[in-house]
Amino acid sequence: MSLLTEVETPIRSEWECRCNDSSDPLVAAASIIGILHLILWILDRLFFKCIYRRFKYGLKRGPSTEGVPESMREEYRQKQQNAVDVDDGHFVNIVLE
């Protein structure tokens, strides 16, 4: 005897959606929130580099460089970059015995 004959299979009417009362405001609100969440998640995944770069660097404006010679601007940029660069000497190698 096959295992399939031993298992109860739901009849077709049990598979259908039982929420025929879709005029319920809670169901409508949940649907709208779900769709908005999906749209925002997709946009976040598509543009996350632009969005987070804007938050990280765009909101923290540095000092104004108006009237400052280009050589001093370049020196300032270099200092800022050196402060950001990771120094490999800070890492500790642990050897387990």
Curated annotation (Swiss-Prot):
Annotated site, Seems to be involved in pH gating, chain positions: W41
Pfam families the UniProt entry points to: Flu_M2
Virion surface topological segments: 1-22
TM spans (from-to): 23-43
Predominant cellular place of this UniProt entry's protein: virion
InterPro entries in the record: Flu_M2
Regulation: The M2 protein from most influenza A strains is inhibited by amantadine and rimantadine, resulting in viral uncoating incapacity. Emergence of amantadine-resistant variants is usually rapid.
Note: When the channel is activated, one or more imidazole moieties of His-37 probably become bi-protonated.
Subunit details: Homotetramer; composed of two disulfide-linked dimers held together by non-covalent interactions. May interact with matrix protein 1.
Protein's job: Forms a proton-selective ion channel that is necessary for the efficient release of the viral genome during virus entry. After attaching to the cell surface, the virion enters the cell by endocytosis. Acidification of the endosome triggers M2 ion channel activity.
HAMAP family: INFV_M2
Record text about domains: Cytoplasmic tail plays an important role in virion assembly and morphogenesis.
Record's protein name: Matrix protein 2
Gene from which the chain derives: M
